[in-house]
């Protein structure tokens, strides 16, 4: 009886700050995913930017949202979560609003970088709040509420985007700015800082821990291998959206959904990719979590990666709208299966005395996944898919693709399926040869990572020469890509060599 009463009253075991934090998470993620569900289409179709330019923009913006949480958490601990939340929501509001008012590439890029800075500062503050406002008894449920607020925001916001973009595309940006502006009110007047830890890390220690993690070749090898799967994920915000627009005959889905009165008029557009992804997770995450709860981390990860790449195989062999939906849903099931167990696996392979530190850097997969995925998808789409895209009238009429065009489409998606296979094979090899923290595995990983860093540096040098000296004029996009590769590759070489001295 007491246990039943406890379960009924679990909602009342959380302080008000916990619920305010989740409300903020819901609206911030709604603003973020609402805009990004259509951003790639808007930049290409409305503003006329090239796919490759959009890919570069997205890669840097998305990567920044994964890098900055390192500093956002440290600043929150030192200055107080409430102050940094006010800064974060101010930057988010300014970034979204400014991006909606500009139509030149550079200014939109700058505006979205401001947005990404706000998002990166915001992320660790909410997870920190949830962690500090829950107890051992209710933390599992508390983090469940947190994850639901993320996916529910990502699921519902694109429905609003589907409606409001019909009036004016800029309203999508303005609505995202509005959601973040409104969150300034609870941040300023309702939210209270959770109790701070007794020992607040100075920024110097945060940077020292970052160097410790980045110099661990065995850990970085795991990040690199797993980030290959996230190359597939970031197609959901670029190439998948363009493919839906350019190749998919959507009338059957439109006709079916029109039968639901509340959805009339219905048009299956880009934003529904995010709706399918987030909706699949919202509907099935509890079931998948229960099935995998007591299973070992690595086998579940491997199965999830395999399911995810099968979603891209589905995209490769049909351009039916229903099969397109199935492909996105299958990938989403793979994502929700693999990703939670990834964090469990990090806890197993990290040095046991530094597990908490390493868990704080597990998100680095998103940096590499976005930098490679957004650029690769955009380059391949512009070169291989855009030239064979049929006229819009043919797509609307459902005219089948020619055998040659269908073959190219199949090859395009099979490239990403192959990357999924590469990730799966890499994870199997990693678990077999690198999962234990021994001098032998560390030395082997150090040699591999040094080789990877050298290759990236060499490619960066080639891109630099290509952009400055082998082209009639400076290729700014290639120049930026070369600088990123030189920073990552060269920095990796220096860190690796320093760790051996």
Predicted feature residues:
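Short amphipathic helix-loop junctions that connect adjacent transmembrane helices
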Residues: 37-53, 238-269
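Central cavity-lining transmembrane alpha-helices of secondary-active solute carriers
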Residues: 56-74, 275-288, 368
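Conserved MFS/SLC helix-loop-helix module at the cytosolic interface between two early adjacent transmembrane helices
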Residues: 67-103
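Cytoplasmic membrane-interface "Motif A"-like loop-to-helix N-cap segments
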Residues: 77-89, 137, 291-305
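C-terminal ends and interior cores of transmembrane alpha-helices
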Residues: 90-104, 306-319
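Intracellular juxtamembrane helix-capping segments at the cytosolic ends
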Residues: 121-135, 337-351
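Glycine-rich segments within core transmembrane alpha-helices of 12-TM secondary carriers
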Residues: 140-165, 179-183, 362-377
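Symmetry-related core transmembrane helices of the 12-TM Major Facilitator Superfamily/SLC fold
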Residues: 170-189, 406-429, 484-488
């Amino acid at each position: 009886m007491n246990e039943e009463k406890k379960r009924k009253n679990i909602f009342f075991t959380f302080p008000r700050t916990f619920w305010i934090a989740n409300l903020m998470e819901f609206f911030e993620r709604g603003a973020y995913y609402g805009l990004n569900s259509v951003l790639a289409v808007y930049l290409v179709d409305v503003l006329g930017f090239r796919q490759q330019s959009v890919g570069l923009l997205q890669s840097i913006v998305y990567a920044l949202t994964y890098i900055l949480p390192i500093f956002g958490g440290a600043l929150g601990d030192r200055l107080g979560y409430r102050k940094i939340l006010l800064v974060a929501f101010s930057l988010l509001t300014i970034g979204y609003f400014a991006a909606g008012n500009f139509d030149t590439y550079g200014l939109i890029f700058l505006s979205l970088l401001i947005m990404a800075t706000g998002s990166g500062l915001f992320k660790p503050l909410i997870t920190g709040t949830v962690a500090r406002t829950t107890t051992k008894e209710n933390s599992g449920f508390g983090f469940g509420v947190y994850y639901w607020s993320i996916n529910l925001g990502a699921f519902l916001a694109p429905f609003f985007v589907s409606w409001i973009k019909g009036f004016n595309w800029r309203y999508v940006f303005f609505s995202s700015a509005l959601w973040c502006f409104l969150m300034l009110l609870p941040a300023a007047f309702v939210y209270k800082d959770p109790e701070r830890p007794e020992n607040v890390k100075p920024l110097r220690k945060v940077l020292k821990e970052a160097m410790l993690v980045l110099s661990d070749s065995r850990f970085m090898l795991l990040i690199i291998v797993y980030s290959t799967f996230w190359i597939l994920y970031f197609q959901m915000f670029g190439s998948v959206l363009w493919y839906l627009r350019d190749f998919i005959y959507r009338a059957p889905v439109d006709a079916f959904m029109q039968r639901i009165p509340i959805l009339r008029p219905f048009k299956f557009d880009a934003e529904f990719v995010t709706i399918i992804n987030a909706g699949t997770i919202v509907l099935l995450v509890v079931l998948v979590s229960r099935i995998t709860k007591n299973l070992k981390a690595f086998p579940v990860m491997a199965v999830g990666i395999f399911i995810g790449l099968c979603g891209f195989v589905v995209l490769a062999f049909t351009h039916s709208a229903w099969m397109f939906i199935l492909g996105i849903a299958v990938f989403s099931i793979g994502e929700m299966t693999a990703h939670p167990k990834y964090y469990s696996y990090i806890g197993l392979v990290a040095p046991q005395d530094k597990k908490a530190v390493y868990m704080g850097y597990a998100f680095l997969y998103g940096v590499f996944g976005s930098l490679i995925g957004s650029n690769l998808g955009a380059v391949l789409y512009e070169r291989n898919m855009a030239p064979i895209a049929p006229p819009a009238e043919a797509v609307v009429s459902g005219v089948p693709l020619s055998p040659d065009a269908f073959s190219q489409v199949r090859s395009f998606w099979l490239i990403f399926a192959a990357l999924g296979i590469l990730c799966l094979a890499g994870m199997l090899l990693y678990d077999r040869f690198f999962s234990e923290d021994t001098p032998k595995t560390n030395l082997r990983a150090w040699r591999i990572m040094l080789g990877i860093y050298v290759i990236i540096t060499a490619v960066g040098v080639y891109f630099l020469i290509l952009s400055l000296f082998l082209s009639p004029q400076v290729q700014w996009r290639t120049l930026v890509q070369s600088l990123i590769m030189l920073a990552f590759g060269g920095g990796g070489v220096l860190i690796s060599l320093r760790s051996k001295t």
